[in-house]
């Protein structure tokens, strides 16, 4: 299937044959598994010192003293020690570094999940259901000439995004970003940031600097493209802009 290629003014200038990866069936179940597997691989194993709470000289005084028969310090004050319910005692069931905390996924399933997430970016219904504004987007997938990769100024990318019809979605991401409700504000996640358009390029020649200050916009080189870029929060159908070189590289990788 052939689709149009647009210049930086939003005008069609050429046509390109889409790679077969855009015909992959929609598999939200695999996409969700792949994203969760990617999340869990960022978790760091944690454990406790095996001797924590046990560095005490204690004794059990036995029965007949009118007090609980727990381990107590040998020297006054004879506080309870060592046991889990005592101050400074050991943990009853501490976390172990041996715990399996990573979710696994088969290689072929992960590859199929990425292919399915790529195909979902070309489906208007899936993209709209994710919350993106695509009323002025001329086509999906939106493919742009490679000159976009060289734009390094924020004001220039703003004008380009307006002409391509994706600026409304960036404004949506800006309006939805703000201070989080609840106690998460005190726990290192004060702000919520909405996801806007994704820019996939064949090579970074300055576009990262030009687009990084726009709220919700991410730029990724196609060789580093992962399922988390295409389906943030396990929700596929992200509004995506592709360059011609990125499409050709997709053809080499996925066919």
Curated annotation (Swiss-Prot):
Belongs to the universal ribosomal protein uL4 family. It comes from the Archaea. It comes from Pyrococcus horikoshii (strain ATCC 700860 / DSM 12428 / JCM 9974 / NBRC 100139 / OT-3). Keywords: Ribonucleoprotein, Ribosomal protein, RNA-binding, rRNA-binding. InterPro entries: Ribosomal_uL4, Ribosomal_uL4_dom_sf, Ribosomal_uL4_euk/arc_CS, Ribosomal_uL4_euk/arch, Ribosomall_uL4-arc. The keyword ATP-binding does not apply. Part of the 50S ribosomal subunit. GO terms for molecular function: rRNA binding; structural constituent of ribosome. Pfam families: Ribosomal_L4. One of the primary rRNA binding proteins, this protein initially binds near the 5'-end of the 23S rRNA. It is important during the early stages of 50S assembly. It makes multiple contacts with different domains of the 23S rRNA in the assembled 50S subunit and ribosome. Forms part of the polypeptide exit tunnel. This is Large ribosomal subunit protein uL4. GO terms for biological process: translation. One of its GO terms (cellular component) is ribosome. HAMAP family: Ribosomal_uL4_A.
